Amino acid sequence: MSATELFARRATLARSVRLLSEFRFEQSDPARFYGALADDTAAMVADLWQAATETTPGGRTVLDVGGGPGFFAAAFTRRGMEYVGVEPDPREMHAGPAAQVGGRYVRASGTSLPFADGSVDVCLSSNVAEHVPDPWRLGNEMLRVTRPGGLAVLSYTVWLGPFGGHETGLTHYLGGARAADRYTRKHGHRPKNDYGSSLFAVSAHDGLEWAASTGALIAAFPRYHPRWAWWTNAVPGLREFVVSNQVLVLQP
């Protein structure tokens, strides 16, 4: 069984439309947006684990690098997984339900994880790589702490995709710095995802190249696309613009 066989059945057009409809609530109602994303992510990881290892995910430890305010903890706990969140910013850790839901939390950087080699079953990073200046150092750390036979799942927003600019919208096609400046003039403050400091241009090509270089890549697909559109991730150039988020699945 391929690593994506189970998740591919879930990757329908209806799912894509449902998730897309939630994006408009990211700023106004983060609990709604991140709650829906967390449920979908936990289901995706469970499917990937079961297909890749032919075992159930219950009781497995998942390390969520960049866990933020804790919306993902409840979703993984409901599936019987032991959740550990890693977040460097205490403001993020206190911006949501981290203190009220299951799981444990560690304040640390994803590029220098305070965990032993091969100490977790699953290491997940969801929409974090584009926020660090060296995303593949993050990826290497994820692989280091994942036990042999486990899974490292790195999902990130592709810069030239439609959501690459985050809250600056499609103006990122004019350039990241220019988009951030336009946002500042309009709103009177810098964007949370500020190009060059908290947002960086990460391409689909670079992610695939890094993953291939590790020798551990077992799957790569566009996270929010229906299964019949996954072919776009195999077309250089095209994938940079039509793949909004790329998932790299690695098995040490």
UniProtKB/Swiss-Prot annotation:
One of its GO terms (molecular function) is S-adenosylmethionine-dependent methyltransferase activity. InterPro entries: Methyltransf_11, SAM-dependent_MTases_sf. The keyword Repressor does not apply. Keywords: Methyltransferase, Transferase. Pfam families: Methyltransf_11 (PF08241). The keyword Transferase applies. Its EC number is 2.1.1.-. One of its GO terms (biological process) is methylation. PANTHER family: 2-METHOXY-6-POLYPRENYL-1,4-BENZOQUINOL METHYLASE, MITOCHONDRIAL, METHYLTRANSFERASE. Belongs to the methyltransferase superfamily. This is Uncharacterized methyltransferase Mkms_0228. It comes from Mycobacterium sp. (strain KMS).
